[in-house]
């Protein structure tokens, strides 16, 4: 008997999530993980590191509640958005009995988190224009306890129609939790569904400081939901999820002056996105640039593998989507600095 055979059967069969960092590469320009291109500068207080952190750092809870326009009772701080995903699955799904439902092409961690927990997965692909297929979702809700949707959707970049999310909430009422992943909402804040929280107790929203706040290394995310749902999740979350240094920096990031800085830098990035989209459209290798409301662009190439490989060899690391459902020959490009965007365009232009 080996150590592997002692592990759970579903773990033995598990294909782990291939994060951008795990895929690696020897890059000088990293545009594969939807990270912000520059790092903010904060100072750690360095105090109380000998003490365990608060179960929920109250200054961070209050600061995020103020930022999001909700009560502190609506906020749970997590180790990145991914812990929020895992937490909801562990809390609401019975292993080998219940299922989650997700709509590919979308973020891969929904399925991986369910598989790790021994929970079944159902997938209802998005429509050709990357919107929810509500009739098919309705037909597949048996045994589903959690439905995950992502808006703006990763990797396609588009927003889901709010009217469709509203319909989804109505058909799942009393049956399942609906999780709307808003990791990229700072790039289109007017599209948030946060105003629906008060009327739909089965709605949970995933947020993060990893994208527009440029703090991916901090691992700080949030679940926003009604107080009853937050209380249930609080029973399951680890006792000390947020390290003191992470809480310290998160609280600084959520101060009004820094939020104003984030909003200004976001506008600069959106300008870079617009420039990049226009520049890519005229390249002979690029067949389509999909509309995006996030900090990345999805492009379809004549030969996506050739483009990806050519840039990889030059140290420009993008995210290959060729094996993703309905995204053959597609590449996802994180919007970087203007200089990085220019180098991407020049490199693709040279691909034969």
Curated annotation (Swiss-Prot):
It catalyses: L-histidinol phosphate + 2-oxoglutarate = 3-(imidazol-4-yl)-2-oxopropyl phosphate + L-glutamate. It comes from the Bacteria. GO terms for biological process: L-histidine biosynthetic process. Coiled coil: none annotated. Pathway: Amino-acid biosynthesis; L-histidine biosynthesis; L-histidine from 5-phospho-alpha-D-ribose 1-diphosphate: step 7/9. The keyword Cell wall biogenesis/degradation does not apply. Pfam families: Aminotran_1_2. Its cofactor is pyridoxal 5'-phosphate. Its EC number is 2.6.1.9. InterPro entries: Aminotrans_II_pyridoxalP_BS, Aminotransferase_I/II_large, HisP_aminotrans, PyrdxlP-dep_Trfase, PyrdxlP-dep_Trfase_major, PyrdxlP-dep_Trfase_small. The modification N6-(pyridoxal phosphate)lysine is found at residue 211. One of its GO terms (molecular function) is pyridoxal phosphate binding. The keyword Protein biosynthesis does not apply. It is an enzyme of class 2 (transferase). Keywords: Amino-acid biosynthesis, Aminotransferase, Histidine biosynthesis, Pyridoxal phosphate, Transferase. Homodimer. PANTHER family: HISTIDINOL-PHOSPHATE AMINOTRANSFERASE, HISTIDINOL-PHOSPHATE AMINOTRANSFERASE-RELATED. Belongs to the class-II pyridoxal-phosphate-dependent aminotransferase family. Histidinol-phosphate aminotransferase subfamily. This is Histidinol-phosphate aminotransferase 1. It comes from Haemophilus influenzae (strain 86-028NP).
């Amino acid at each position: 008997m080996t150590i592997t055979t002692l592990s759970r059967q579903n773990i033995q069969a598990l294909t782990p999530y291939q994060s951008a960092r795990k895929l690696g590469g020897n890059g000088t320009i990293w545009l594969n993980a939807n990270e912000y291109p520059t790092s903010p500068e904060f100072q750690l207080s360095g105090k109380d590191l000998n003490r365990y952190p608060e179960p929920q750092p109250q200054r961070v809870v209050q600061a995020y509640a103020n930022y999001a326009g909700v009560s502190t009772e609506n906020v749970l701080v997590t180790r990145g958005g991914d812990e929020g995903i895992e937490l909801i699955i562990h809390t609401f799904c019975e292993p080998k009995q219940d299922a989650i439902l997700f709509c590919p092409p979308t973020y891969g961690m929904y399925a991986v988190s369910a598989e790790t927990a021994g929970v079944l997965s159902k997938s209802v692909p998005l429509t050709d224009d990357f919107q929810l297929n509500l009739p098919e979702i309705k037909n597949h809700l048996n045994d589903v306890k959690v439905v995950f949707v992502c808006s703006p959707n990763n990797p396609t970049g588009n927003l889901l129609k709010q009217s469709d999310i509203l319909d989804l909430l109505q058909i799942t009422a009393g049956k399942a939790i609906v999780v709307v992943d808003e990791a990229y909402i700072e790039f289109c804040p007017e599209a948030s569904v946060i105003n629906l929280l008060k009327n739909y107790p089965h709605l949970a929203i995933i947020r993060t400081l990893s994208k527009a706040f440029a703090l991916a290394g901090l691992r700080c995310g949030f679940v926003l939901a009604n107080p009853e749902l937050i209380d249930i999740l609080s029973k399951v979350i680890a006792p000390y999820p947020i390290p003191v240094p992470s809480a310290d920096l998160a609280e600084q990031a959520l101060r009004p002056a820094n939020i104003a800085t984030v909003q200004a830098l976001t506008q600069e990035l959106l300008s870079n996105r617009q420039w990049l989209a226009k520049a890519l459209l005229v390249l002979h290798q690029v067949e389509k640039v999909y509309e995006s409301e996030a900090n990345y662009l999805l492009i379809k190439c004549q030969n996506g593998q050739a483009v990806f490989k050519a840039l990889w060899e030059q140290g420009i690391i993008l995210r290959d989507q060729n094996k993703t459902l309905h995204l053959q020959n597609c590449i996802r490009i994180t919007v970087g600095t203007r200089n990085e965007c220019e180098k991407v365009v020049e490199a693709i232009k040279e691909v034969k």
